[in-house]
Amino acid sequence: MPSALVLVHDAVPGRGEREVGTVGPALAELGFDVLVTAFQPGAPPVPDPGDVDVIVVMGSADAAYDDTVPWLGAELDLLARAVGHGTPVLGICFGAQALARVLGGTVARAPRSERGFVALGSADPDVLERGTWMQFHDDAFTLPSGAQQLARNEVGLQAFVCGPHVAVQFHPEITPDAFAAWLDAWDEAGERAALEAAVDIPALVADIAARADVTEAACRRLVGRFCARAGVTAS
């Protein structure tokens, strides 16, 4: 059975697993043994990237360019070793930014935040289909040398592919429960009031629920194409 490492960035036990959304089930349906963990005290040990078949790096409230984040150095080192070993990495939002940084790109504050569902094209539908994807980010990244741009809009680069690695700025994994976990984290951090001043949270919650079936199917296809392209299957 192939193995998948899914890295989350929440210190609260159980909440990181909720934030994985549809990515975990998509990998399980493909026959992967899925380990969800984090560089956090009390989390299961993070395996060596050479001991797993694929790695998925999820989003984070922290910035991939903020070297004061306690666990960031360890995670960037793991991704660098994964790239060196040839272990395919799928980076989602923060994960895409971290992957871009490891591959030689840069990460910085975006010209503006993106919140909600955004329609994106694709330079290669065999990797990333054209569609409407949920965005929730403040940062942006540049295209690493040797990578192929998959999607871009007026805010910046939205997706790229580099060898077996795929990076997407948006959140294909989003579900009502995953977003509820985000809300819990924002409440705990005292950030929800500021977000509600900038975003119509009830409307976004309703939109996520209304699109849940379509979003889940699109995530399954994205994960399936990533694994197939990397040549990692249960068979």
Predicted segments with their positions:
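N-terminal beta1-alpha1 cap of cysteine-dependent amidohydrolase-like domains
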Residues: M1-H85, E196-S235
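Amide-donor transfer/coupling interface in amidating biosynthetic enzymes
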Residues: S3-L7, A108, S122-S235
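Short glycine-/acidic-enriched loop or helix-start segments at secondary-structure transitions
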Residues: G16-E17, V46, D66-T68, A100-V102, ...
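Short alpha-helical
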Residues: R18, Q97, R115, T142, ...
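A short acidic, often aromatic-flanked loop/helix-cap motif at beta-alpha or helix-coil junctions
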Residues: P41-P45, R115-F117, F141, L157-A159
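Structured loop/turn residues at beta-strand edges in well-structured enzyme cores
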Residues: G50, S113, S145
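Cysteine-nucleophile active-site neighborhood
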Residues: V57-D124
